[in-house]
């Protein structure tokens, strides 16, 4: 039992020993990466400064008036500035050039026996200057970028594009796609039209309207056209009586002014059509011709007209027009 309770001596756990030899290369790699990042940042800042300087010079040129030159004139101007007859961007110590060894982004100019050296000049900037002088481009082997000329041409066309855009906007302001209601024209038309108690009336006078009564095929005058109402029927659609034999034509199921006075009142009050009473037919009597009194020169009227008027009164009484005429 005592063997189970014996305590083992404490042995602390020890971690692996630090590798000094491996830490040194890691630190060196970190320092190299940091230096590379610093150099990259400095290079990026320099490039940004160069681009800003180029944009500033281009804006100054756009503000002034540039006189374009042809290729021959620009070549002669450049040849006059350089004793060797050309502008040489030096990329290193060239054989026979006589120039010291400089960096690849350095521009060297000679004018009147004096040499000018410009530091940090890119090939794009040199080509832009040559294009301003008259359209001369760099040689293919001088490190020029083809896309730079296109980018510069876009910048040169920018003022023209802005001018055209401003003209388009001015024209667009004058356009109005909404419908304009010309109240002045409507007012002129309304003033020319004739009115009767505030309502527009026909341009014809009352005398002309009275004389222009339209007669239907049956021979009944169309009085509704004079009053501005729809034309009335020549006869009642229910009982068949003529429009001239009734005091007025009234509204019916077929429309306005389609029933006689009696049928129209029945339809308006009760909503039904009245029963038409058919009386016995009246026999026609043959009356001898009228006799002429040659001595007195007086023509005696026959009883035909009186008989016809009596027949019409009998028909009207049978249809009930005499009893309804007072109600109308």
Curated annotation (Swiss-Prot):
Induction remarks: By drought and salt stresses.
Subcellular location: Nucleus
SMART domains: TIFY, ZnF_GATA
Domain CCT: 161-203
Keywords noted in UniProt: Activator, DNA-binding, Metal-binding, Nucleus, Transcription, Transcription regulation, Zinc, Zinc-finger
Domain (Tify) ranges: 100-135
Main localization category: nucleus
Family annotation (CDD domains): ZnF_GATA
One cellular component term from this protein's GO annotations in UniProt: nucleus
GO molecular function: sequence-specific DNA binding; zinc ion binding
Presence of the UniProt keyword DNA-binding in the record: yes
Gene Ontology process terms (BP): regulation of DNA-templated transcription
Bias kind Low complexity: ranges: 14-29
Domain of life, source organism: Eukaryota
ZnF bounds (GATA-type): 236-263
Family according to the record: Belongs to the type IV zinc-finger family. Class C subfamily.
Function in brief: Transcriptional activator that specifically binds 5'-GATA-3' or 5'-GAT-3' motifs within gene promoters.
Protein name according to UniProt: GATA transcription factor 17
């Amino acid at each position: 039992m005592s063997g189970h309770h014996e305590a083992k001596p404490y042995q602390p756990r020890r971690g692996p020993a630090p590798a000094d030899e491996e830490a040194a290369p890691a630190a060196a790699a970190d320092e190299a990466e940091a230096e590379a990042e610093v150099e990259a940042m400095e290079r990026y800042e320099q490039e940004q400064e160069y681009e800003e300087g180029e944009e500033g010079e281009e804006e100054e040129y756009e503000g002034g008036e540039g006189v374009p030159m042809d290729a021959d004139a620009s070549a002669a101007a450049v040849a006059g500035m350089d004793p060797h007859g050309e502008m040489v961007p030096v990329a290193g110590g060239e054989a026979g050039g006589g120039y010291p060894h400089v960096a690849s982004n350095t521009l060297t100019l000679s004018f009147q026996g004096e040499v000018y050296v410009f530091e940090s000049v890119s090939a794009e900037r040199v080509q832009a200057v040559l294009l301003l002088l008259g359209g001369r481009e760099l040689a293919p082997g001088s490190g020029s970028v083809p896309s730079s000329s296109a980018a510069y041409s876009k910048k040169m066309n920018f003022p023209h594009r802005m001018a055209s855009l401003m003209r388009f906007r001015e024209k667009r302001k004058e356009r109005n796609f909404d419908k304009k209601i010309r109240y002045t024209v409507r007012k002129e038309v309304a003033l020319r039209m004739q009115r009767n108690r505030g309502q527009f009336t026909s341009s014809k006078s009352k005398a002309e309207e009275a004389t222009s009564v339209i007669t239907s095929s049956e021979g009944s005058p169309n009085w509704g056209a004079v009053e501005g109402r729809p034309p009335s029927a020549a006869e009642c659609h229910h009982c068949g009586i003529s429009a001239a034999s009734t005091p007025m034509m009234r509204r019916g199921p077929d429309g306005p002014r389609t029933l006689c006075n009696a049928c129209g009142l029945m339809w308006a009050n009760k909503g039904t059509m009245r029963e038409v009473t058919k009386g016995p037919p009246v026999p026609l009597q043959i009356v001898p011709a009228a006799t002429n009194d040659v001595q007195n020169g007086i023509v005696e009227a026959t009883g035909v007209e009186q008989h016809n008027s009596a027949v019409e009164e009998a028909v009207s009484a049978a249809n009930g027009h005499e009893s309804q005429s007072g109600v109308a």
